[in-house]
């Protein structure tokens, strides 16, 4: 026989369940009629978002509870979000912000924003002539929310890395350690990037930015379809991962089907400003507060296109380049290179010295280069009947765009017991008549061989189409 106290407890429990079910039903019906305004917590939400925006005043028209866009969950929305300058002026405006509140603070009656996703608004990134970086969550002309100072004189590499990591600490402050906000994102924002020193300018109508804290790691992810000079577009992405103590970081940049001129200003491209071909590129940079730069490597895959040089235009069949950059020695090390699609390959590591001097050269100034290859294997079926293997190769010269030529002041290589030395130039000039007139490539080379060179090695290095009778004679000998 059931005790009376047990029956009473069961009746109370059933009553609570019924009340809860009725409450859920009423809430579902009310939400189906439209959002429920919760303006009583507006001040709390404004304060939380203001703290995430470096203390800038944030205004909200109203806060409401509604079904998510997918209709399978509830979400809190801040409608009509504005970021002000502290004097009543509006710097940026977002249509709405979707907000996630922390569960544990709610249990003790405290409102704490855990994540916020803004829709719309504007962002501006400006690189100043002195190298300082200003990031503003607002249109062009807005005061910077984040400032990464310019590089001081006589700054060591380790000091520069430490300064960049300090700048990341400022950038990640909204979701940094010790705060309740774990995620901050902006969707479909108007993005403007300005390079005041190089003269470049890029815009995007629907840029996305996300700051997130996951355990002991912080992550910034951004993607946008940038529009640069001449209306060229470049889908680009950026990802920065660091730890909550900002001791190290990895920066990854990528671009898909982008023209170089859409990503970089002419000043940044230097002698390569005339390159016009679709490109997929990835660059990874690793930084450590104690060791400096620990990783700097990238890959670029080019499609068919053209290159302009002093009024002439030349066709490119595409190719692939992979390499890494040694900052301490200012040396670019290329470990994979292919041209003319995949038909032409160069095996071995190519060391390019004084890379910064090459990139600093203006488009109309000679760009000097110094290239060394400890051992290399040329596989160029269109020019040589067999792969050519050389060692101790060094090529010194300059790209002279004004002369439409590449000068070689020193070419040195070794094949077996023979040492080859040469100088000359590779040039382009108008040739032909009528419909056949066009830009043709020419080669002028003066060289000599010291030591002994096997006739078979000569045949391997003999260019196809040059003195075929002599080459056949050597082959029969």
Task: Tell where the protein language model's regions lie, with residue ranges.
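Transmembrane beta-strand segments that form the barrel wall of outer-membrane beta-barrel proteins
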Residues: 80, 189, 219-224, 331-339, ...
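Secondary-structure transition motifs
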Residues: 46, 51-53, 57, 73-75, ...
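N-terminal type II signal-anchor transmembrane helix
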Residues: 1-53
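Generic short beta-strand segments
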Residues: 61-63, 79-84, 96, 121, ...
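Beta-propeller and related beta-repeat scaffolds in trafficking/envelope systems
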Residues: 90, 199-219, 223-231, 237-246, ...
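Solvent-exposed loop/turn segments connecting transmembrane beta-strands
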Residues: 39, 228-234, 311-313, 341-347, ...
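Short edge beta-strands and adjacent turn/loop segments
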Residues: 60-73
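A short, amphipathic edge element
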Residues: 55-62, 276-278
